[in-house]
């Protein structure tokens, strides 16, 4: 909705400043590395930080790239180094514990945001958390456990939205859960 603002760090600053001035709760911002290139990534991130955002997430692709190509680790590392007052969350191509580890340990982000990979592996959050809490890398789930997750998702969604809607929604997700990464 606001990707065009990636061309104008001053606009980002003024909009974030205006929003934070009327909120009494934390505001987080997620942005891409840029519109068609990442030349303004650091400036955009610093604009949001100086305007009072509580945390910043950045997807390592430009708006033009959408979901093609690869996450721009170099740009995320530059932004991570520049952002010093708030948590910086890296996003893009986090499909495994090793991807999360690389972002945190090598790029210097404070946290990671998992996106599309969770559609194939909802267990990824448990795997990443366990690794950072204990150093243990959990193996891929066996098929029966994946089936349990799909069934639990169906039950919970049914409780929330009703059986008919839940079945329709889980029908598209269950094959991805069972197939895995």
How does the language model describe each region?
Residues 4, 29-41:
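Active-site mouth loops of central-metabolism enzymes
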Residues 10, 14-17, 22-24, 38-55, ...:
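Alpha/beta catalytic cores of nucleotide-metabolism and tRNA/nucleoside-modifying enzymes
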Residues 1-7, 58-68:
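Glycine-rich, proline-tolerant flexible connector loops at the mouths of alpha/beta enzymes
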Residues 29-33, 60, 90-92, 116:
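A cross-domain feature marking catalytic cores of carbohydrate-active enzymes
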């Amino acid at each position: 909705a606001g990707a065009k603002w990636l061309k104008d760090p001053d606009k980002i600053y003024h909009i974030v400043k205006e929003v934070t001035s009327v909120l009494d709760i934390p505001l987080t911002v997620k942005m891409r590395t840029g519109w068609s290139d990442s030349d303004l990534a650091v400036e955009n991130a610093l604009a949001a930080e100086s305007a009072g955002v509580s945390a910043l997430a950045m997807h390592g692709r430009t708006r033009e790239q959408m979901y093609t190509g690869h996450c721009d680790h170099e740009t995320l590392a530059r932004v991570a180094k520049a952002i010093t007052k708030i948590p910086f969350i890296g996003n893009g191509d986090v499909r495994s514990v090793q991807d999360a580890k690389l972002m945190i340990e090598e790029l210097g982000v404070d946290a990671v945001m998992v996106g599309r990979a969770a559609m194939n592996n909802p267990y990824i959050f448990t795997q990443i958390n366990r690794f950072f809490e204990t150093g243990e890398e959990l193996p891929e789930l066996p098929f029966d456990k994946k089936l349990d997750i799909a069934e639990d998702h169906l039950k919970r969604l049914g409780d929330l939205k009703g059986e008919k809607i839940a079945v329709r929604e889980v029908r598209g997700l269950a094959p991805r859960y069972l197939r895995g990464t």
